Swiss-Prot record:
GO MF annotation list: acetylcholine receptor inhibitor activity; ion channel regulator activity; toxin activity
Tissue: Expressed by the venom duct.
Source species: Conus imperialis
Upper classification of the organism: Eukaryota, Metazoa, Spiralia, Lophotrochozoa, Mollusca
GO cellular component terms given for this protein: extracellular region; host cell postsynaptic membrane
Protein name: Alpha-conotoxin-like ImIIA
Signal peptide range in chain numbering: 1-18
Keyword Aminoacyl-tRNA synthetase in annotation: no
Domain-level remarks: The cysteine framework is I (CC-C-C). Alpha4/3 pattern.
Amino acid sequence: MGMRMMFTVFLLVVLATAVLPVTLDRASDGRNAAANAKTPRLIAPFIRDYCCHRGPCMVWCG
């Protein structure tokens, strides 16, 4: 396999790995809308209950 062919294969692999996550993110947003909406409700109590009672994190808890 020549250098030009190896470079072409390398570019194809890089482009495929760069494009695939973008298309997967767009496709998953519609299907996981309920999960995405529920996430802030789950994170806020965790931060309040777990992190606000620890010394280093209390700065962020107001």
